[in-house]
Amino acid sequence: MKPKVIVVMPAYNAARTLRMTYEKLPKEYVQSVILVDDGSTDETIAIARELNLEVFVHTRNYGYGANQKTCYAEALKAGAGIVVMVHPDYQYDPTLLPEIIQPIIDGEADLVLGSRLRAGSALEQGMPWWKYYSNRFLTWLENVSFGLHHTEYHTGYRAFHRSLLEAVNFSMNSDGFVFDQEIIAQAVACGARIGEIAVPVRYFREASSASFFQSTIYGLRILWLLAKYVLHKTGLHKSRQFQSLHRRYAAADESEKAHGTV
């Protein structure tokens, strides 16, 4: 039996691009689309409801990470076997959804990332030079920290197996942009298999993009995250953030049995 595929869209003022993003989704592969609105001031909610999406609304702008927390929690409640995050700003190609879920369906990966740096020249596709080179540097640093060899971690196009989202404690993560890297670090700490596919990217006026200042803060927070991860991995300072929930519950059950409380 094929897993239930649910697309989640973390949205903030996406009225101009939401419809075109949704229309390009290959519906034959998707059982449900969940949109979480993070305090938009435009017509995002109205358009989402017009498209018959399942809509959840934050009463104010809590942040990109907070939006994803609601996305994944609601997708799991809805019985998703595979959860695909698609930004509603049309920056990533929705038609590549079959490719991004296939490694999970084939049992080859628990998390698949859509890499813009594997697809050719991101600079030619419009990625700002400062964003391109900082992406390359941070990805190299993460590869060193994680012991992996991927071409990009800073993508908003990603697919998760249900079991991975149940294992990582994503509720402990930031409500901001660094959530994207925290959940990857958690996946690595849990021993998840991570794959990637090449995806093109579009940069245009309506597409959302972090400013230079936001990107600088994001980069500094990644450095702090990697320091915490390395300390956890080496055993110098264990962090609950990187512990598998499955293992924690199993350890708790064993402890209760040992003390005769079960």
Stretches found by the model and what they are:
Residues 6-10, 57:
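Short hydrophobic beta-strand elements that form part
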Residues 12-27:
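Short, well-formed alpha-helical segments that are part of the catalytic scaffolds
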Residues 58-77, 94-177, 204-223:
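Acceptor/aglycone-binding surface of glycosyltransferases and processive sugar-polymer synthases
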Residues 37-45:
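A conserved acidic beta->alpha catalytic loop
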Residues 14-17, 40, 93:
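Donor nucleotide-sugar binding loop of glycosyltransferases
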Residues 80-91:
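Short beta-strand-to-loop acidic/aromatic patch adjacent to the donor-nucleotide binding site
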Residues 39, 63, 91:
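A short, conserved beta-strand element in the Rossmann-like catalytic core
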